Amino acid sequence: DLLLRLLKKYDVDLIEQSTITGAVVENGRCAALITTNNGQERRYEARSFIIATGGVLGEGFAIEPERAWEPIFNIDLPLNPSSPEWSLPEAYPACRQTPGTPRPSHGFALLGPDVDAKLRPLGKDGNPLCGNVFFIGKTLGGYDHAAEKSGNGVALSTALFAAMNA
């Protein structure tokens, strides 16, 4: 309740129960996000955008047999869903241990787009796709929130960091 009051006080739009269906990118910046809710399309313009759409299980990524990608900005993800590394037969595969975690990770659990030091998603050329877009929480790759039991901590710390850089 306190967080929602603070967000309202500082004029922050929190958009829930909507699907982001696209982005309007102009001159290296995101000008707007397009959402759909109950068949209605809406355009949100802002100075900066913090994206917290989730990972594979939260439907933040689109997946087909030969491709996985982040759908808002059409970012290809580094692991092919047809790869044997996508998931292994064992629930807790011994061959892939995430450093510092009590159990190993499946490839899909570590999936996410590459970001720079400010959490901006990178294009194929290694440069930020948009100077004003920041990815946080489970949208980030390289960590297994379930195995590490770090989901809330990563979500909160990356949200604060992104907000400070936005």
Model-flagged regions — what are they?
Residues D1-A166:
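Residues forming the flavin
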